[in-house]
C-alpha cells in the first residue's frame, strides 16, 4: 500500500469511526445533560429541581414528562424553554414559552400531566411501589438527554399490613425500627 493510499485509508477509517459512533451512541452524546436535583429518587410530595445543561445559548428545547399508571393509562406533559447565555435551562428560574403550561413553574411538568385518553384518572393501586416519571429533553424531535424521577410514597423498610377485622377495613403502615411510633 502506498503512502497516499494509506493516508486516504486512515481518513476514511476516521470518518467511519466518527459517523458510526454518532449513529450508535446514547442520547446524551450530544453533550446535553438533564438532571433532577437533589436526587432522581424522592418522596411523592417533595419538589425537585430540573436542569438542562450543554445547550447552545438561546437554543430552544422541549421537555416532555410521561408516566404510565397501574391501569396502563399514559399521562403526558410538555414545555418549551429557551436556554440562557450559558446554554442552561433551570425550571426554577426560566419560564416555559409554551406547551402544557407557561411561565416559571418548577414542578409544571408534574402537575400539568394529562391522560392521553380523555376522562381518565391517575390510579396507583399499590403505594409500596414508586411512581416513575420519565423526562426527556428534545430538539427537533430528537432525544438529547433523559432521566427518570422515582417518586415514592413510603420510606424504605416500611411495612404495609392490610387490616380486615369484622367491619374494620384499612391498611396499617409500620415504620422500620423498634418504636415506639406515633399513632394516628
Q: Language-model segments: what does each one mean?
A:
Residues 30-60, 67, 71-86, 90, ...:
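N-terminal cap/lid segment of alpha/beta-hydrolase-fold proteins
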Residues 83-118:
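Extended, solvent-exposed segments with strong compositional bias
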Residues 1-3, 181-184:
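Short intrinsically disordered, low-complexity coil segments enriched in acidic
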Residues 18-21, 29-34, 47-49, 101-106:
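A generic short-segment signal for beta-strand/edge and adjacent turn/coil regions
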Residues 1-32:
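N-terminal mitochondrial targeting presequence
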Residues 12-16, 110, 170, 184:
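Generic detector of bulky aromatic hydrophobic side chains
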Residues 17, 23-25, 37, 55, ...:
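Aromatic-residue hotspot detector
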Amino acid at each position: 500500500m502506498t503512502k497516499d493510499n494509506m493516508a486516504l485509508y486512515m481518513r476514511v477509517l476516521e470518518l467511519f469511526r466518527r459517523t458510526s459512533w454518532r449513529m450508535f451512541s446514547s442520547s446524551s452524546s450530544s453533550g446535553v445533560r438533564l438532571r433532577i436535583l437533589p436526587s432522581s429518587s424522592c418522596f411523592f410530595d417533595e419538589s425537585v429541581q430540573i436542569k438542562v445543561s450543554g445547550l447552545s445559548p438561546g437554543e430552544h428545547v422541549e421537555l416532555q414528562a410521561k408516566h404510565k399508571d397501574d391501569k396502563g393509562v399514559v399521562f403526558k406533559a410538555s414545555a418549551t424553554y429557551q436556554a440562557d447565555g450559558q446554554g442552561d435551562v433551570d425550571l426554577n428560574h426560566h419560564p416555559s414559552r409554551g406547551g402544557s403550561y407557561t411561565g416559571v413553574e418548577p414542578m409544571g411538568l408534574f402537575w400539568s400531566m394529562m391522560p392521553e385518553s380523555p376522562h381518565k384518572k391517575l390510579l396507583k393501586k399499590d403505594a409500596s411501589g414508586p411512581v416513575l416519571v420519565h423526562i426527556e429533553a428534545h430538539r427537533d424531535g430528537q432525544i438529547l438527554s433523559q432521566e427518570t424521577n422515582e417518586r415514592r410514597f413510603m420510606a424504605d423498610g416500611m411495612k404495609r399490613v392490610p387490616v380486615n377485622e369484622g367491619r374494620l377495613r384499612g391498611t396499617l403502615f409500620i415504620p422500620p425500627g423498634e418504636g415506639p411510633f406515633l399513632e394516628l
